[in-house]
């Protein structure tokens, strides 16, 4: 949360499975739409929070399978763990962890729940120090929830029980849960003088319901929400104008909520097909780089006309003296790399070629110059290659827009230089 000097314009809190991540959408179309919107318009002054029932290790595994952005905060294990960063570099909130120790004894919870044969323990990867998880049917869950808290209270353990998706049963410390974790984070921001202008919570299942109970937040239940959440809405929130049931699934429903509540820009750059003017907004470096790489993706996929006018437009965006340093170390003028794009037109059409940018930041380093930094991910034939990217941009009065002066990339992780002739920009 220290990334922002002032109060966040928006805190967007999203459940993952079946909310931000649509498991019925193998192409990740709406997730990529959300990614482009967030990086172009929100990353610079807002906070992205993932709030999931998954353990942190399970969440990390999902990041390797889906094009998830790096959040500012990851709330995992149904609110029993808070991690700042949520990517490769993370810091756990030890104060929150210590709070959850109050009237909590995991050994006693395990001992007492073993006496309920209907409770089937979930795999070890789903178990955490402050979360004991089971599978159980709805009717059995209702009966167990009536008696288990009292049994544990007699042994000095104060718990919260969360049932979701028609099968997941979690035993947590009383102060845990998604509501408790988010309330804690909002209180921290308030103490620091960084109370957000708006907060939007997004969910689809029973363990998300308590998020909508937090005062002064906006809430969206995506169209594919589970019956247990819809029932909660009918009984508790149908008259609350700040909470609504979207008509769109998953990420599309989240974008719909941003529009409905007038929380800020709500048109994803992926929904803009103006290839005649594909450069970004005049003084928004984040929007500039997102739009640039979206056009590059569309060129590689053959989704725009193969016309020299587009390549000339690209050249007009960059300085004739501009240099691109390829992640392999090869340096050539940007215009020469643009010329090489002609040979790659449409080569990604059958390869499910996609590009997304993550963690886009920009610094105003002089009166007319910006330095944009981000991670570029490129997916082709199921393989993701990633590089850190720096772009130097200068505002040219005569063009009334930003000009690309220099691009420098470096490979990340296990990304390699195989087929490096097909890696441009």
Curated annotation (Swiss-Prot):
Any single GO BP term: sucrose biosynthetic process
Biological function: Catalyzes the final step of sucrose synthesis.
Cofactors (names): Mg(2+)
Subunit organization: Homodimer.
Origin: domain of life: Eukaryota
Record-linked SUPFAM superfamilies: HAD-like, NTF2-like
InterPro entries the UniProt entry points to: HAD-like_sf, HAD-SF_hydro_IIB, HAD_sf, NTF2-like_dom_sf, SPP-like_dom, SPP_C, Sucrose_Phosphatase, Sucrose_phosphatase_pln/cyn
Listed NCBIfam families: HAD-SF-IIB, SPP-subfamily, SPP_plant-cyano
Keywords of this entry: Hydrolase, Magnesium
Record-level Gene Ontology MF annotations: magnesium ion binding; sucrose-phosphate phosphatase activity
Assigned EC number: 3.1.3.24
Protein name: Probable sucrose-phosphatase 3a
Pathway(s): Glycan biosynthesis; sucrose biosynthesis; sucrose from D-fructose 6-phosphate and UDP-alpha-D-glucose: step 2/2
Keyword Iron: no
The keyword Hydrolase is assigned to this record: yes
């Amino acid at each position: 949360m220290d990334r922002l000097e002032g109060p966040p314009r928006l805190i967007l809190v999203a459940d993952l499975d079946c909310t931000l991540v649509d498991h019925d959408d193998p192409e990740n179309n709406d997730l990529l739409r959300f990614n482009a919107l967030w990086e172009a318009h929100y990353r610079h002054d807002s906070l992205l929070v993932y709030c999931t029932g998954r353990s942190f290790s399970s969440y990390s595994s999902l990041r390797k399978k889906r094009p998830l952005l790096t959040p500012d905060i990851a709330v995992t294990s149904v609110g029993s763990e808070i991690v700042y960063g949520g990517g490769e570099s993370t810091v756990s909130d030890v104060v929150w962890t210590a709070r959850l120790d109050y009237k909590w004894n995991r050994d006693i919870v395990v001992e007492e729940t073993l006496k309920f044969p209907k409770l089937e323990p979930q795999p070890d990867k789903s178990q955490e120090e402050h979360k004991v998880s089971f599978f159980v049917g709805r009717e059995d869950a209702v009966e167990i929830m009536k008696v288990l808290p009292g049994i544990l209270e007699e042994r000095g353990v104060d718990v919260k029980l969360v049932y979701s998706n028609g099968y997941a049963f979690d035993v947590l410390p009383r102060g845990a849960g998604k509501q408790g974790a988010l309330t804690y984070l909002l209180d921290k921001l308030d103490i620091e003088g960084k109370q957000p202008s708006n907060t939007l919570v997004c969910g689809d299942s029973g363990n998300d319901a308590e998020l909508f109970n937090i005062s002064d937040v906006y809430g969206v239940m995506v169209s594919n929400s589970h019956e247990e959440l819809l029932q909660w809405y009918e009984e508790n929130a149908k008259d609350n104008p700040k909470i609504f049931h979207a008509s769109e699934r998953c990420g599309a429903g989240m974008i719909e909520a941003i529009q409905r509540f007038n929380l800020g820009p709500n048109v994803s750059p992926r929904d803009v097909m103006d290839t005649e003017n594909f450069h970004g907004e005049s003084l928004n470096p984040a929007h500039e780089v997102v739009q640039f790489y979206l056009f590059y993706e569309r060129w590689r996929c053959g989704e725009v006309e193969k016309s020299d006018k587009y390549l000339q437009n690209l050249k007009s965006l960059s300085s004739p003296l501009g240099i691109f340093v390829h992640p392999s170390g090869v340096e050539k003028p940007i215009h020469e790399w643009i010329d090489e794009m002609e040979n790659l037109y449409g080569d990604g059409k059958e390869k499910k070629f996609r590009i997304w940018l993550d963690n886009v930041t920009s610094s105003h380093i002089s009166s007319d110059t910006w330095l944009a930094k981000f991670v570029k991910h490129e997916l082709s034939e199921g393989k993701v290659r990633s590089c850190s990217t720096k772009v130097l941009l200068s505002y040219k009065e005569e063009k009334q827009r930003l000009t690309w002066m220099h691009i420098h990339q470096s490979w990340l992780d296990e990304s390699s230089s195989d087929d490096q002739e097909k890696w441009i920009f």
